[in-house]
Regions:
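Catalytic cores of Mg2+-dependent Asp-rich isoprenoid enzymes
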Residues: 1-132
Length: 132
């Protein structure tokens, strides 16, 4: 929507596209594999964030919560990006407010229970990786 593109020209040319093609929503089928590879890389970085959260001592619940919340929201956003057409400017791709509230409550409660916290982080990572 802002007309910005952070995909390198050489990567686009490898799949027969240029920056102008990204203004056409119909280019999504050609663009999707490249885009998904960048989302996969993003998921790898989020895995590092999850590992960091798991290393925070359990007694620091507020810190764990402060780290978990943006990670789970980010992973949910990736899941939506995998399903949506990012080239269609009319299609808004964002986590809705009710989902944000649900994530916040889940993260808050889960910091008391290691198993629940691991489940929330693992499910969010799985959704992001598989687009579900």
């Amino acid at each position: 929507a802002l007309g910005r593109c952070y995909i390198p020209n050489d990567r686009l040319s490898e799949i027969g596209l240029n920056h102008e093609d990204l203004h056409n929503p119909d280019s999504i089928d050609v663009f999707r594999p490249l885009y998904d590879s960048y989302l996969d890389l993003t998921c790898d970085h989020y895995d590092s964030a999850i590992n960091y959260i798991r290393m925070i001592p359990r007694k620091y619940r507020s810190l764990r919560m402060a780290c978990m919340l943006p990670v789970v929201i980010g992973l949910d956003t990736i899941a939506l990006l995998r399903k949506g057409n990012v080239l269609d400017a009319s299609e808004r791709i964002k986590v809705n407010r009710s989902r944000i509230r649900k994530i916040a409550v889940s993260c808050l409660i889960s910091t008391r229970f290691k198993g629940m916290e691991n489940r929330i982080l693992s499910r969010a990572a799985n959704r992001a990786l598989n687009g579900i």
